[in-house]
């Protein structure tokens, strides 16, 4: 069995780990446009200096080795072809799968409060790039 997991946030990481627990022999490939695993919930700690990028990581140090998960980082899935059981990455690479887990997360939302969206000191944090 070959699994592809798209997204390396909490859902993707835990999904990949759970897949491994259910299938010890499967090939599991986790694909993320991010270069780091990090908790989006505490990005504000990076902004105020309480944590470094490395300190935002919520996985054990040897996570990918321990669970035998191949991590393709810094690559974005640009196309999913369900009928062919494949994904295409932004560099043109095609990866085949038998099952896919989409764990791409959400997006930041600024509520429709008067003048809030126009304010220059309001920022929606979604990913590490927003905090840099």
Whereabouts are the PLM-identified features?
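Beta1-alpha1 glycine-rich phosphate/pyrophosphate-binding loop at the start
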Residues: 2-70
């Amino acid at each position: 069995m070959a699994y592809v997991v798209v997204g390396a946030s909490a859902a993707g990481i835990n999904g990949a780990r759970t897949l491994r627990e259910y299938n010890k022999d499967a090939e599991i490939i986790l694909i993320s446009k991010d270069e780091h695993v990090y908790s989006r919930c505490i990005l504000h700690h990076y902004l105020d200096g309480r944590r470094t990028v490395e300190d935002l990581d919520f996985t054990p140090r040897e996570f990918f080795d321990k669970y035998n998960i191949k991590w393709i980082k810094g690559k974005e899935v640009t196309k999913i072809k369900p009928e062919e059981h494949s994904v295409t990455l932004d560099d043109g690479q095609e990866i085949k799968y038998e099952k896919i887990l989409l764990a791409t997360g959400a997006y930041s939302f600024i509520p429709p409060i008067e003048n809030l969206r126009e304010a220059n000191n309001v920022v929606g944090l979604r990913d590490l790039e927003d905090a840099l």
